[in-house]
């Protein structure tokens, strides 16, 4: 494990021409203090956890005293926001410091979120508030523990500096990590802005640094598109399986690596509602839970359109190649999602006919507003007479559930497994704990009073979502009535 000064930064993105980024310096961040620190993320870059206690740590990761090799840049990109194309966006409050390369050869790009205004701030203050940084910090680590590809969070650094949103809040900086923060919108900017050479340069950069195995393909840019489609299908299937709604799936919030990125007004399902809208600014439900696969395809189509000049010199031929790649998305998503849901039901192998079993169950759950996480966690014990009454009681029509359960028993019978083995497998994929909005809100309320203990407690809990952790049982309870009044939006 390294000392802070031994971390060796490079910034490969900064080596690209000025058209790709700006070079602002981090704004002053008065009297900073540490709010939270993630030892698991620190281990990814070989940073010794004791280093987080040093003043130099806070100074380095608020951008005040750079470490060797740090070269801050803010990325430029465009994006479709709620379906409307915005030709220039960019990092309005974020700076990529550079990458740390591990002895194993992995590279982690470190980014400050909330570091102050940049050329892309569009008149905003370039700050993030404590509330939103806590939500992103906890969510990224919760999603990682659930097996969902995601950016990671190293630390939150706070300040008493006031930030003006719907109310006066305090400033914070989130240090987040990913192999890359390049987005679909990065390609859209150069494609629609009329910069074909820059578009090719960006694609070559992404292939060289993140998909080197594609470089020798006969059609490397088509292979890039196909790979991103496949990764995105896998990502969205995992969102749907764990009951996660992102809330703002603009193309500038879509990772070229298939990671969950830019946690804003997200939410995990409480009661199973297919049309769940977690973002109260999403008045038409464009980004509702059940719309996420469709929107992912739409966003991929935007990426494909941006890449058309690279797919074939003849536009019509390029369109056909893109369509063929996009046509595979639905099958890739369905295959992954069905396998994940089959595992949640304890099936060793998912068959085509199992889709009906899955969809019937979800229909029953929707009709009775059954808690998504708690039900699947409990379902593994349906064979136990002590558990079955509570399972039945969750449904408004217990007889309909009985009919489904009979078919489910018969399906399990074909596999001939012992109940204990099946239960163990189900407990390993059906979490007991997820980051419900009210849990995050309780941690935020304490943190705003300078008590960060609940942030740490939730972090430790969510690192082990599949473990019983009996001392934390209260965190697996149904949400309280007041939780329904929590509204989250893009304000951060």
From Swiss-Prot:
State a single Pfam family of this protein.
Answer: SelO
Give the UniProt keywords, A-Z: ATP-binding, Magnesium, Manganese, Metal-binding, Nucleotide-binding, Nucleotidyltransferase, Transferase
At which positions is Mg(2+) bound?
A: 253, 262
What does the record give as the reaction this protein catalyses? L-seryl-[protein] + ATP = 3-O-(5'-adenylyl)-L-seryl-[protein] + diphosphate; L-threonyl-[protein] + ATP = 3-O-(5'-adenylyl)-L-threonyl-[protein] + diphosphate; L-tyrosyl-[protein] + ATP = O-(5'-adenylyl)-L-tyrosyl-[protein] + diphosphate; L-histidyl-[protein] + UTP = N(tele)-(5'-uridylyl)-L-histidyl-[protein] + diphosphate
- Enzyme class at the top of the EC tree: transferase
Record-annotated active site: 252 (proton acceptor)
- Its Enzyme Commission number? 2.7.7.-, 2.7.7.108
- Do you know which PANTHER family this protein is assigned to? PROTEIN ADENYLYLTRANSFERASE SELO, MITOCHONDRIAL
- What name does the UniProt record give this protein? Protein nucleotidyltransferase YdiU
Its lineage reads:
Bacteria, Pseudomonadati, Pseudomonadota, Gammaproteobacteria, Chromatiales
**UniProt gene name:** ydiU
């Amino acid at each position: 494990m390294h000392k802070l000064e031994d971390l060796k930064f490079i910034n490969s993105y900064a080596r690209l021409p000025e058209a790709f980024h700006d070079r602002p310096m981090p704004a002053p961040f008065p009297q900073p203090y540490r709010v939270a620190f993630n030892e698991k993320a620190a281990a990814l870059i070989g940073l010794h956890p004791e280093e987080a206690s040093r003043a130099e740590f806070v100074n380095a990761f608020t951008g005040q005293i750079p470490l060797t090799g740090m070269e801050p840049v803010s990325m430029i990109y465009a994006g479709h926001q709620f379906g409307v194309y915005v030709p220039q966006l960019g990092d309005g409050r974020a700076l990529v410091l550079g990458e740390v390369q591990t002895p194993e050869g992995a590279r982690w790009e470190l980014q400050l979120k909330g570091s102050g205004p940049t050329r892309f701030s569009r008149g905003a203050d370039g700050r993030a508030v404590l509330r939103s940084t806590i939500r992103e910090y906890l969510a990224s680590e919760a999603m990682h523990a659930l097996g969902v590809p995601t950016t990671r969070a190293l630390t939150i650094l706070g300040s008493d500096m006031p930030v003006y949103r719907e109310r006066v809040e305090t400033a914070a900086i989130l240090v987040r990590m990913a192999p890359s923060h390049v987005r679909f919108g990065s390609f859209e900017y150069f494609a629609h802005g009329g910069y074909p050479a820059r578009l090719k340069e960006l694609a070559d950069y992404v292939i060289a640094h993140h998909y080197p195995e594609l470089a020798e393909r006969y059609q490397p840019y088509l292979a890039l598109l196909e790979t991103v489609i496949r990764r995105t299908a896998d990502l969205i299937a995992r969102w749907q399986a764990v009951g996660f709604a992102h809330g703002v799936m603009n193309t500038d919030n879509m990772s070229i690596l298939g990671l969950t990125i830019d946690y804003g007004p997200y939410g995990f399902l409480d009661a199973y509602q297919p049309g769940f809208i977690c973002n109260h600014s999403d008045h038409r439900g464009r980004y509702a839970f059940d719309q996420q696969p469709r929107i992912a395809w739409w966003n991929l189509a935007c990426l494909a359109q941006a890449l058309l000049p690279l797919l074939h010199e003849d536009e019509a031929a390029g369109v056909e190649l893109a369509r063929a790649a996009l046509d595979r998305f639905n099958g890739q998503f369905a295959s992954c999602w069905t396998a994940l849901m089959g595992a949640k039901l304890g099936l060793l192998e998912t068959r085509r006919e199992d889709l009906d079993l899955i969809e019937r169950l979800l229909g029953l759950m929707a009709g009775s507003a059954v808690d998504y996480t708690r039900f699947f966690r409990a379902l593994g014990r349906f064979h136990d007479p002590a558990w079955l009454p509570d399972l039945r009681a969750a449904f408004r029509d217990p007889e309909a559930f009985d009919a489904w359960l009979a078919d489910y028993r018969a399906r399990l019978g074909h596999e001939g497994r012992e109940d204990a083995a099946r239960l163990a497998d189900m407990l390993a994929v059906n979490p007991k704990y997820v980051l419900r909005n009210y849990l995050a809100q309780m941690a935020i309320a304490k943190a705003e009073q300078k008590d960060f203990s609940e942030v740490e407690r939730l972090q430790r809990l969510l690192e082990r979502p599949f473990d019983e952790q009996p001392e934390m049982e209260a965190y697996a309870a149904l949400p309280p009535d007041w939780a329904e009044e929590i509204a989250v939006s893009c304000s951060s």
